[in-house]
Amino acid sequence: MSADFINQPTFQYKNEYTTQSGNHNEVCVLIGHSIEAVTSAVVLASLGQRVHLYADNELLTQQIQQYGFEHHLQALWQMYEQQQVIISTALPASADTLIQYYETTNFSDSRHINESNEIDDQSTVALYWLFLDSIKPVWAEASWITAFNHSHQQSLPVIISGTEKLGVVSALAQNLQRAWVYYVPFVFLQEGDVYSSMLNPSLWLLGEKTANSRQHLEVLKPLMQHARAAHHADIATIEFARSSIMAMLATRVSFMNEMSRLADSQQVDIKQVSRIMGLDARVGSSYLQAGWGFGGNTLPTELAKLQQSSQTHSLDMPLLQSVMHINEDQKELIFRKFWQYFDGFIDNKTVMIWGGSYKSGSGRTAGSAIHPLLALLWSYNIRTLVYSDKAQDELAMLYQQQSLLQLINNPYQQLSAAQAIFIVSWSPQDQLDIAKLNQHAMPVFDAQNALTRLQIDSLVGDYMGIGRSK
């Protein structure tokens, strides 16, 4: 990827906002190794800011490698690191050490955290941004709060990000003595396109400890202005809104998956039903796709935290429990269709699996249906040929000792050796070659409902989807 290409989407931001952001000697201090922290560092650098990122170096390297499919982010990260616009440094053992370093009059004196970094003597901190998931294993909560409360720079804003039980972030903000404390939930982040989804967020939520104080976050002004929708409120309200949004999305997915089972019994195509439902403005079209369910880290983590919140207050949430139960059961549904198709005679077969990530465009397999599917297939000594271009490295690492797994580089490679095809995650941008499938006339078990009705009708072999069939 050329430097010219890399700079195209950020050029207007730099021209428009670099002069507004004021002091070029300011640095944004980010603390975390998560994909949210890395993306924030790159986006801030794209907006003309200098960034110091503190993280566990080993975990940071792993995170960047695991998100190798985020090509734009990777290229920008490398470029900004080479230019020292982003400087990543090992996270010190205590928050006090880090804060004291920035409160010295000369960053380059003997109290250097990392002596290899060449930092302008006149640098000042624009903000601190804490990513809770990353700091919790290293810094005890009481110690980092005390360190920030003992800081001599109480006018500096502190941003907190992370998914916690309801009220946790609000309590942290109250324990911090400074007025300018904010909460930014990453409800806008779209895996597979994390950079663009943060640069132009679909929804920007900002929790404020002190009402109507967002003017103190001048650095983030471009993101707020370019968001398709934005809202600010007290931190507790934003926490609750974040959790409610994610729970609603998960509920829609599980509802459609429950309806897909009824659609199977009625010989109705649930995909067509989803399109019709989307025409109703009261319903909308988002998250109405039936399939194997949802995975990743965001929705499952959010539901788990919400469940913990309800238990803390002794509240029963049967709807939430049903959503989680349906989702886990749905991941095994496509295997049951496979078992029924062959009347249980599935031992020692060979099958092809297309896709392994939890969503098309991602290279992450956390919560993906491929894991229970593989476990069930292997329990019958079934050989599995898996094509998953973006998730191949992660699958190879997870299952390196599994002799029944073979990772292949072409979806049509070894089709003649398989007795069935499973589709777990297939990108809409990748055209399916129905003619090649028809050369073998094997059954297709589509857990993603990836095929169009025209493609299904063109198949010589049988087709079983989720709430749809041939």
Where are these regions (language model features)?
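Flexible, Lys/Arg-rich cytosolic regulatory linkers and terminal tails that connect or flank
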Residues: 12, 175-198, 202-203, 454-470
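NAD(P)+-binding Rossmann beta1-loop-alpha1 motif at the extreme N-terminus of oxidoreductases
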Residues: 3-71, 112, 351-386, 465
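Active-site rim loops that border cofactor/substrate pockets in soluble metabolic enzymes
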Residues: 359, 380, 384-409, 414
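Rossmann-like adenosine-cofactor binding region
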Residues: 399-470
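Rossmann-like NAD(P)-binding element
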Residues: 81-155, 413-431
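Rossmann-like NAD(P)(H) cofactor-binding subdomain of soluble oxidoreductases
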Residues: 106-109, 124, 130-192, 451-456
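Interdomain hinge/lid region at the active-site interface
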Residues: 236-239, 250-344, 349
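Internal alpha-helical scaffold of NAD(P)-dependent oxidoreductase catalytic cores
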Residues: 171-182, 193-285, 312-313
